[in-house]
Amino acid sequence: MFKQLRPALASLLVLSMVTGVAYPLLVTGIAQLAFPEQANGSLLRDAEGKVLGSRLIAQKFDGEEWFHSRPSAGDYATVSSAASNLAPSNPALAERIARDAAQERIADQGPVPLALVTTSGSGLDPQLPPQAARYQALRVATARGLPLRLVEDLVESHTERPLVGPAVVNVLALNMALAGLKR
């Protein structure tokens, strides 16, 4: 019996060291060398180096002077990130969308873009389509006392056009740039 147990324990120990220690350290080392920013969470910092957030996780922005992210079913908490899981026929979904649309609606701007009233699959999507950011530009410019053209140009300069997929605007990066503007 011990003849069979010894090789099994040796295999367990060796495989545990390889898969639990050596491989993770190797992958972490390669990631730190090849992609240091991404390996450390794609963090966004202010001028003093203070971490304000990650490019990968949405944050809640209250107030008329900020661009708003997509709604979050989990109130932007990473621990409880999830979709709302409400069926299209659920009255609670219709009520929430109507409430969010009323909050985001800007006179004479047409219908509120869908991205501003619907949650993403994770509830933490940090990006908006450019048209959703442009829709908010008038509200933000008015609240901050800035020329609309300046705010629209800021949205355009923060529009990312990936090789594959639609153009997007990272709301945290956009709001950081907005905070740096003189009123």
UniProtKB/Swiss-Prot annotation:
The answer to keyword ATP-binding applying to this record is: yes
Presence of keyword Signal? no
Q: Which UniProt keywords apply?
A: ATP-binding, Cell inner membrane, Cell membrane, Ion transport, Membrane, Nucleotide-binding, Potassium, Potassium transport, Transmembrane, Transmembrane helix, Transport
- Localisation: Cell inner membrane
Domain of life (superkingdom): Bacteria
Q: What InterPro entries would the database entry show?
A: KdpC (IPR003820)
Q: Name one GO molecular function term.
A: ATP binding
The record's Gene Ontology cellular component field reads: plasma membrane
Transmembrane regions: 10-30
Q: How does it sit in the membrane?
A: Single-pass membrane protein
Q: How does it assemble?
A: The system is composed of three essential subunits: KdpA, KdpB and KdpC.
**Protein's job:** Part of the high-affinity ATP-driven potassium transport (or Kdp) system, which catalyzes the hydrolysis of ATP coupled with the electrogenic transport of potassium into the cytoplasm. This subunit acts as a catalytic chaperone that increases the ATP-binding affinity of the ATP-hydrolyzing subunit KdpB by the formation of a transient KdpB/KdpC/ATP ternary complex.
* Family designation: Belongs to the KdpC family.
Q: What is this protein identified as?
A: Potassium-transporting ATPase KdpC subunit
Lineage per the UniProt record: Bacteria, Pseudomonadati, Pseudomonadota, Gammaproteobacteria, Pseudomonadales
